[in-house]
A protein has these predicted regions:
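A cross-family "folded-core" feature that marks the main globular domain of proteins
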Residues: 1-188
Length: 188
């Protein structure tokens, strides 16, 4: 378990202060996951699509971290198992950092495909959960952002209203500087 945790920390750039607690939880889950995998026992798969869509970086980091364990035991965990393992890591990240789920406002307009691409890139930037709300650009100009919004992002050029949380004009693909700025806002 220690190697798995160390690998996850190295890949994610985040550190757990209570490795023993995380190790115990992972050990318990992975023992059951190995048994389910070896005996082809399925689990509910409704959660996997949501995890893949909402936490793509967390899921990808978990897959990379656990690859050595899969190789060591000559197993391939299902997507469902991988999703549950990712949830364990995600929950510990939230607990460790005492971070709350960040609320992001995505300003929408006339290009839903572009807006979906911006949302996907946002979700790729952080391991932590995001709640993404949507607001029309014109409505944002009149009323600003709802309370509790940590970041406003839009693919459209728009002037700031009188008061607004930090606003980033996103041009895809997001540049390295924009990615760092967004990650800093979301993970602080």
């Amino acid at each position: 378990m220690e190697l798995l945790i160390q690998r996850f920390q190295a890949l994610s750039g985040m550190v757990f202060s209570n490795d023993a607690g995380l190790s115990a939880q992972l050990y318990t889950h992975l023992a059951q996951a190995l048994e389910r995998t070896l005996f082809s026992i399925g689990i509910d798969h409704n959660l996997v699509d949501d995890i893949a869509q909402q936490y793509p970086r967390l899921l990808r980091t978990t897959r990379e971290a656990i690859a050595a364990l899969e190789q060591q035991y000559s197993v391939q965990f299902t997507d469902e198992e991988m999703g549950l393992i990712a949830i364990i890591f995600g929950a510990w990240l939230m607990q460790e950092s005492a971070l709350q789920e960040k609320q992001v406002l995505l300003l929408i307009g006339r290009d839903s495909e572009l807006e979906q691409q911006v949302e996907q890139q946002l979700r790729e930037l952080t391991l932590l959960p995001l709640t993404i709300k949507y607001q029309d650009v014109a409505d944002f100009q009149r009323h600003s952002a709802p309370k509790g919004i940590a970041l406003v992002i839009t693919p459209y050029a728009t002037p700031l209203p009188l008061y607004s949380p930090p606003l980033i004009h996103a041009e895809l693909p997001l540049g390295e500087h924009q990615q760092r700025s967004i990650r800093l806002l979301l993970e602080s």
